[in-house]
Amino acid sequence: MSNHKLIEAVTKSQLRTDLPTFRTGDTLRVHVRIVEGSRERIQVFEGVVIKRRGGGISETFTVRKISSGVGVERTFPLHTPKIEKIELKRRGKVRRAKLYYLRSLRGKAARIQEIR
């Protein structure tokens, strides 16, 4: 077996199939497993997907939320075992792949229209 085929086989076995399909502009609830010492807990991060990048095992996505008036962005590897589950709350209608312009918008201007 060549190196390329070996890498492809290992990568395919590591990909997760239990995740919903989502796009930029969608609102997600990401349940992340956090380990603190010997304790383990689930932390929920809810926000708008502002970008997706990469492909295969190295694919990542960034979720942005407003917490106490401060914008918080968190980037997650899509296929990591640390993500317990991803819930799709609503689908957003956007015409861009990267929503960096949301960083400069405040309040109602930062809303994204929902797909019916």
From Swiss-Prot:
PROSITE patterns: RIBOSOMAL_L19. One of its GO terms (biological process) is translation. Pfam families: Ribosomal_L19. The keyword Oxidoreductase does not apply. Belongs to the bacterial ribosomal protein bL19 family. This protein is located at the 30S-50S ribosomal subunit interface and may play a role in the structure and function of the aminoacyl-tRNA binding site. PANTHER family: LARGE RIBOSOMAL SUBUNIT PROTEIN BL19M, RIBOSOMAL PROTEIN L19. This is Large ribosomal subunit protein bL19. It comes from Staphylococcus haemolyticus (strain JCSC1435).
